[in-house]
Amino acid sequence: MFKVARASQYLAITGGGIEDIKLSKKSWVFPWQRCTVFDVSPVNYTFKVQAMSAEKLPFVLPAVFTIGPRVDDTEALILYARLISPHDKQSNHVNELVEGVIEGETRVLAASMTMEEIFKGTKEFKKEVFDKVQLELDQFGLVIYNANVKQLVDVPGHEYFSYLGQKTQMEAANQARIDVAEAKMKGEIGAKERTGLTLQNAAKIDAESKIISMQRQGEGTKAEIKVKTEVKVFENQKEADVAKANSELAMKKAAWTKDAKVAEVEATKAVALREAELQTQVEKMNALTRTEKLKAEFLSKASVEYETKVQEANWELYNKQKQAEAVLYEKQKQAEAQKAEADATFYSKQKEAEGLVALASAQGTYLRTLLDAVQNDYSCLRDFLMINNGTYQEIAKTNALAVRDLQPKISVWNHGGEQGIGGASGSGMKDIAGLYKMLPPVLDTVYEQTGMQPPAWIGTLSK
């Protein structure tokens, strides 16, 4: 059965396949499991705690505590589900539990403090009560969301706080009279002090005005001298800049004159060099002309014979090249055929490897899905695979062949006669009942004949 909890609820599931308690907002609940729904919304608890101070003075502490499970802590929720969830949150059991914790901690804390300390340090007293109560509630997975501790109240027959209030009122009235008298005294003294201070401040201001006037005159003289000095420095700096610029200009003019003279000399020498080069080229051309004339006269016959020999050699070379190209073409075709055969073999092996990878990936996905289904229980996965692959049948077959000529122990059982319930629904229930009755003897027989224990989630064998 699939169950879903409300927004402020949790499912506490116990039973087969769960080690302790499983908390969830929604889950499948199997027949061998139990599910309890518990609410985690906080509840208000109102108390009037009677306590006694260190002076044995009783008092009443009205308080309203908003208490509920700690929803942000899984361990606390499991603790609450184990100890508190079987009881209704408004039940006397839970109410007495919370009230007992609050009263016990409040009384212990109040017994260590005087009434004066409790009354004057109310805020600290409330904080101490809150901290100590929270420490005790942690044992039950509960947390205090809000604690409203009201003003301390007298126990009937004891008027300590009433008298303490009257004392405070009288002290306030007396203090008010003292404050009025002190205010009048301070007013008269202050008036006289203000008059004296006025005269003192007037004389002080006159003296300071004269001093400031002299300081201003001195500062004006200093500023005038400073400005004149800066003007003189600026003039000297500009004169130096002009002298520097004139010097740089003279140096540049000298460099330009030098470059012009060097360029003129280089041009003259370049003309002379060019004339010499042209004369050399003319002489070379004359020598080449004479050489060509001699070649034409003496080497014409040798050239004809040379050309004839070259043509014959070229023809032989052409024939040999064609023969070599034919052999090379044949070798290339053989190499291409071998390459095509190797490519086909490689493609076949590659596809076979891809098939193995796809098979391994599918088997990995199958195993991960089975592990998720059994919540990462490897023993359950192993048993399922052995059943699904027929391992148990093969073991039984092997054992039967081994003991064929012996006298094995054969277990025969009968799960009783059929009891008709009626209809298709009755037939289905008979099959399920027969299956459950048949399962323990089968497991006993397997254990006796093979020594193999059934998985933990099926149950233990009867001894």
Swiss-Prot record:
Keyword Lipoprotein: yes
Stored InterPro entries: Band_7, Band_7/SPFH_dom_sf, Flotillin_fam
Coiled-coil ranges per UniProt: 305-354
Kinase among keywords: no
Top-level taxon of origin: Eukaryota
Keywords: Cell membrane, Coiled coil, Lipoprotein, Membrane, Palmitate
Cellular localisation: Cell membrane; Membrane, Caveola
Gene3D superfamilies, alphabetized: Band 7 domain
Main location: membrane
Disulfide bonds: none
CDD domains cross-referenced by the UniProt entry: SPFH_flotillin (cd03399)
Protein name as it appears in the record: Flotillin-like protein 2
Organism of origin: Arabidopsis thaliana
